[in-house]
Structures are given as structure tokens and as C-alpha cells.
């Protein structure tokens, strides 16, 4: 088992350092990211593509990389009532890349193992509920296939890898006991490092499941759009179990209590009332950013009303991972130009809701 801090020196140069809570300025995140991608694409537009080498072998768990031309899309389908749809055939799907319909391969529905990075926000705001997280994760791990692997990262003042890839639930349980709380939240750094370091050694489907309020304290070097790009490059689906609603309830109750007191008490607590209102605004913006982050990667945002609900929430994520479709296609666009390509998946039932990532980066030269 590897027990080390993830290498912080592999982050971007310090010129990218951001101010506290600057992630709140990133909405709408997807528009900003797509503008950056478009700028990159314009710079590469005149580059001549390299020929595709012959004889590339594609193993069962392969996803798009420099060494393969086949693209794998993890796809979740829900009906109009929100229930998982698990019985579709290949003929029920249509896949589009940059608006152009693609042909699915014969291997469109094969079962692919999933490598899951479990991440926990161990900052002071979550310290009192780590036992609930440990219990929920153990239940989650028990519901995965024996072929699936798990790694564990905690983030606060530091981003720390507590458990490298393992199929051992015993090792995971031991690592969960080693989570100790810190003070601050390096959320963006944690996403970047999970994508570029941990998922670089993953196979099959890639998933990140994180418990957090999504509020980065701005003490790292990574912006939220940088983290999103890294997730898309790693072809990771992110599921966020957000405690924003739990924190919102606490702040609203305190704010309502203060506002209901006498005018003299309201004046006396004016600073605290202002802090609570600003805290609610920060939670709202953070939640919108988390919703865009999960939507862009084909994941899902969960907002349990109490930490007692974590067991059920993580069980729901495990259920979704067990019933994802793995759709494979070989792009009609053969250029190896490293550009971002938007994808869209539809089903023959218009009322179905299909979730997958917004696109992928083509192989480079």
C-alpha cells in the first residue's frame, strides 16, 4: 500500500495561484471551459495530423488514449421518473460527435470494471462526521464487483493518498481509520491530482466520488476549470455527495433565530447576520458549480439532508455504477490533433434522461 502525499510540485506553476473563494467567480463553468478549449483548438487548427499506427490492440478495459482510436463512453440512463433503465440494447442508442452520428461497435454493451477514487473533505467543517463517511464507504465497497478497484484520497490543508489501488476491503477499512481532520479545503488541487496522478494508473471506467461542500479555500494552485479539464482528460465521471444542504439548514436556522429576536439583539448581532447571509450565498454558488462539474463528466450531484443519509447515498452511487452502459465507437474523425470533441448520446425513447461526459480530447500526434 502506498502511503504518501501526492506530489504537490506537479501542480501548475505558482503564477496560477488563486485567491480565497475565487472558484465562486467561475460560474458558468462550462462556458468558460469551452472558451478555453476553443482557443486551444484554434491554435492547433493548422497542425498536420499524424497517421494512425497499424496494429493497435484494444483490451476489454481500454478507453481513449494515444494508443487506441476506440472511444468508450460510460452512460447512465434514467426514465422520466428517475429510475435506472438497465435493459436497453445497442440499437436503442445513438451517439454523436461534434454533431455527426457515429456507429457503435459490436462491443457496445460489454461489462467493464470500474476504478473508483474515493475522496473525502477532511477540513474542520466535516470533522465531526468522519465516522458516518467511513461507514458509508465500507457499505459502498461491499456493493462493488470483485473486479472493481478503490483508492482513497483525503484533502484539507494537504492532498494525501491514504490508499493506492486495491480490491481488498480489509485494506480500505484500515486506511479509512487513518483519516484525521485538518483546517482548510484544497478541493481543486485534490481533483487535479486525482485525475493526473491516480487515474493515470487506472483501467476500465474511471469514477471519482467525493464528499465535500465544494468550497475551495484558495490556498492551492488550481482553478475549478483546470480541475474540470483534468477530469475530462482522465475520462473520469465525478459523483459529488455534497453537504451544502446540511450546512444551509444550520445557517438558516441560526439566521432565522437572530432575525426573530428583538431589534436591539439584531443590531448587536449585525456582523454575525452578515456572515450567515454571505455563507448562504457562498453555498448556493458552490452548489451550482458542483452541479455543472458533475453534469459535464456524466456524473450526479447528491444533496443528503443529514449525515445519517450517507449510507443510502453511497449505495445509490454504487447502484448506478453497476448499471452503467459502456458504449464504444470508433470516431469518423481520424485526426490525431489533441482537440476537444463534444459528444452527445440519445436513446430511442425521448423521455429517457441520458448522462455521459460532454466530450473527450482526441489523441495527440
Q: Could you tell me what each predicted segment is?
A:
Residues 4, 17, 25, 46-50:
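Compositionally biased, intrinsically disordered/low-complexity regions enriched for serine, proline
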Amino acid at each position: 500500500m502506498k502511503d504518501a502525499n501526492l506530489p504537490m510540485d506537479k501542480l501548475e506553476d505558482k503564477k496560477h495561484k488563486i485567491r480565497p473563494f475565487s472558484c465562486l467567480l467561475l460560474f458558468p463553468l462550462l462556458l468558460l471551459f469551452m472558451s478555453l478549449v476553443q482557443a486551444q483548438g484554434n491554435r492547433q487548427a493548422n497542425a498536420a495530423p499524424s497517421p494512425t499506427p497499424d496494429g493497435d490492440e484494444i483490451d476489454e478495459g481500454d478507453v481513449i488514449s494515444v494508443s487506441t482510436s476506440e472511444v468508450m463512453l460510460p452512460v447512465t440512463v434514467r426514465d422520466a421518473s428517475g429510475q435506472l433503465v438497465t435493459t436497453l440494447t445497442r440499437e436503442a442508442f445513438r451517439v454523436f460527435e461534434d454533431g455527426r452520428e457515429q456507429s457503435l461497435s459490436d462491443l457496445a454493451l460489454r461489462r467493464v470494471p470500474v476504478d473508483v477514487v474515493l475522496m473525502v473533505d477532511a477540513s474542520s467543517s466535516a470533522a465531526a462526521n468522519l465516522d458516518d463517511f467511513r461507514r458509508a464507504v465500507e457499505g459502498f465497497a461491499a456493493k462493488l464487483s470483485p473486479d472493481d478497484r478503490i483508492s482513497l484520497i483525503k484533502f484539507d490543508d494537504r492532498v494525501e493518498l491514504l490508499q493506492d489501488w486495491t480490491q481488498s476491503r480489509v485494506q480500505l477499512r484500515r486506511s479509512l481509520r487513518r483519516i484525521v481532520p485538518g483546517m482548510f479545503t484544497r478541493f481543486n488541487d485534490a481533483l487535479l491530482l486525482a485525475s493526473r496522478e491516480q487515474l493515470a494508473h487506472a483501467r476500465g471506467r474511471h469514477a471519482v466520488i467525493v464528499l465535500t461542500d465544494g468550497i475551495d479555500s484558495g490556498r492551492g494552485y488550481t482553478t475549478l476549470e483546470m480541475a474540470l479539464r483534468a477530469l475530462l482528460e482522465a475520462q473520469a465521471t465525478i459523483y459529488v455527495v455534497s453537504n451544502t444542504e446540511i450546512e444551509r439548514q444550520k445557517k438558516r436556522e441560526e439566521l432565522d433565530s437572530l432575525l426573530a429576536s428583538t431589534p436591539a439583539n439584531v443590531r448587536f448581532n449585525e456582523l454575525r447576520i452578515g456572515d450567515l447571509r454571505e455563507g448562504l450565498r457562498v453555498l448556493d454558488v458552490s452548489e451550482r458549480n458542483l452541479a455543472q462539474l458533475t453534469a459535464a463528466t456524466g456524473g450526479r450531484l447528491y444533496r443528503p439532508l443529514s449525515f445519517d443519509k450517507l449510507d443510502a447515498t453511497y449505495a445509490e452511487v454504487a447502484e448506478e455504477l453497476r448499471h452503467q452502459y459502456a458504449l464504444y465507437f470508433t470516431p469518423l474523425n481520424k485526426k490525431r490533433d489533441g482537440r476537444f470533441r463534444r459528444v452527445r448520446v440519445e436513446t430511442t425513447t425521448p423521455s429517457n434522461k441520458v448522462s455521459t461526459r460532454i466530450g473527450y480530447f482526441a489523441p495527440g500526434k
